[in-house]
């Protein structure tokens, strides 16, 4: 649906060249809710602006719905843009226009009939839960209601793609949750592909099925949300995951436990998925290795509606200790594990 092929984007200011994007490659599949996460200045917003040609790539290719738009003119982009809706952090509503007229604006500009405009706007306001606000003005609405108006406006042209640039960053946690629920409903009801730009890992965790992690203009990690949460490969991905889920004990706790430890030991970090949570893993390990298993840390969370568990286990070691059977058990049970010591 959306594909970036070795995309780079540079800005030239005075005598300075700023590389906003460097060799970015990944694909957003049809019906995905695809998250792009990174800190401020990572290049996220520049990336999403390439999709609707608000910016043009310096190098590489941008493919949108099978069209290579990299070198498209504004005229060539007109039909493509009809299939792309966009919402922003600060809503971008017309304060002098009613809610109805704000939502209707794309149809008015497309010179649709009054009958079609009324029918379509009414449908969208009902979908976002604002039918009773149609005659009010943006200044009379809450932040969450303003974003719902923006979503209705983005959907009124029946797009295939919805771009969300920090759409929940200006909202409180409760309102954010309601907007994310609405966006998930947009995806499921209309089959719209959503590309989410955010710096909040909780947004990725709650709504996205796939994610790309950006740092300094580059994509440093991609995968399903479950893959990235279960085994983040890069430091920045690990840092983002730790903002919403504690996946291991604190350094101070490990240091204290190590100081109290008598004899050699080996630690394992394991990730247990929902289908395995009810399995007698600890009991199995005790029987396999013939010794006690210490649980130094355990944390349960929900990712995409699935319960997952992170554990840190410790085995005391002696000459008879053989980790081969333990490793084999984890592999047979399809439990992701990492030997820590």
Curated annotation (Swiss-Prot):
It is found in: Cell membrane. This is Methionine import ATP-binding protein MetN 1. It is a peripheral membrane protein. It comes from the Bacteria. It catalyses: L-methionine(out) + ATP + H2O = L-methionine(in) + ADP + phosphate + H(+); D-methionine(out) + ATP + H2O = D-methionine(in) + ADP + phosphate + H(+). GO terms for molecular function: ABC-type D-methionine transporter activity; ATP binding; ATP hydrolysis activity. The complex is composed of two ATP-binding proteins (MetN), two transmembrane proteins (MetI) and a solute-binding protein (MetQ). GO terms for cellular component: plasma membrane. Residues 2-241 form the ABC transporter domain. Part of the ABC transporter complex MetNIQ involved in methionine import. Responsible for energy coupling to the transport system. Keywords: Amino-acid transport, ATP-binding, Cell membrane, Membrane, Nucleotide-binding, Translocase, Transport. Its EC number is 7.4.2.11. ATP binds at residues 38-45. Belongs to the ABC transporter superfamily. Methionine importer (TC 3.A.1.24) family.
């Amino acid at each position: 649906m959306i594909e970036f092929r070795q995309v780079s984007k540079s800005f030239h200011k005075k005598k300075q060249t700023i590389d906003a994007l460097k060799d970015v490659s990944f694909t957003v599949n049809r019906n995905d809710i695809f998250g792009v996460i990174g800190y401020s200045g990572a290049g996220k917003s520049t990336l999403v602006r390439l999709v609707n040609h608000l910016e043009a790539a310096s190098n590489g290719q941008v493919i949108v719905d099978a069209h290579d738009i990299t070198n498209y003119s504004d005229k060539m982009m007109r039909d493509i843009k009809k299939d792309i809706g966009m919402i922003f952090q600060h809503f971008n509503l017309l304060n002098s226009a009613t809610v109805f007229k704000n939502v209707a604006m794309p149809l008015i500009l497309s010179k649709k009939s009054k009958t079609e405009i009324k029918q379509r706007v009414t449908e969208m306001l009902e979908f976002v839960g604002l039918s009773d606000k149609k005659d009010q003005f943006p200044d009379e609405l809450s932040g969450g209601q303003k974003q719902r108006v923006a979503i209705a406006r983005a959907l009124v042209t029946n797009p295939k793609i919805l771009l969300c640039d920090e759409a929940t960053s200006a909202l409180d946690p409760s309102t954010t949750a309601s907007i994310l629920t609405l966006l998930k409903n947009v995806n499921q009801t209309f089959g719209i592909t959503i590309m989410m730009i955010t710096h909040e890992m909780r947004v990725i965790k709650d709504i996205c099925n796939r994610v790309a992690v950006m740092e300094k203009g580059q994509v440093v990690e991609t995968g399903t949300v479950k893959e990235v949460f279960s085994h983040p490969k890069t430091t920045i991905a690990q840092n983002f995951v730790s903002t919403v889920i504690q996946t291991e004990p604190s350094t101070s706790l490990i240091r204290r436990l190590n100081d109290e430890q008598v004899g050699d030991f080996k630690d394992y970090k394991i990730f247990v998925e929902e289908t395995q949570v009810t399995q007698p893993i600890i009991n199995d390990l005790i029987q396999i290795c013939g010794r006690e298993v210490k649980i130094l840390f355990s944390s349960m969370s929900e990712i995409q509606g699935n319960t997952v568990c992170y554990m840190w286990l410790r085995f005391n070691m002696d000459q008879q200790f053989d980790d081969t059977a333990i490793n084999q058990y984890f592999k047979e049970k399809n439990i992701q594990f990492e030997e820590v010591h």
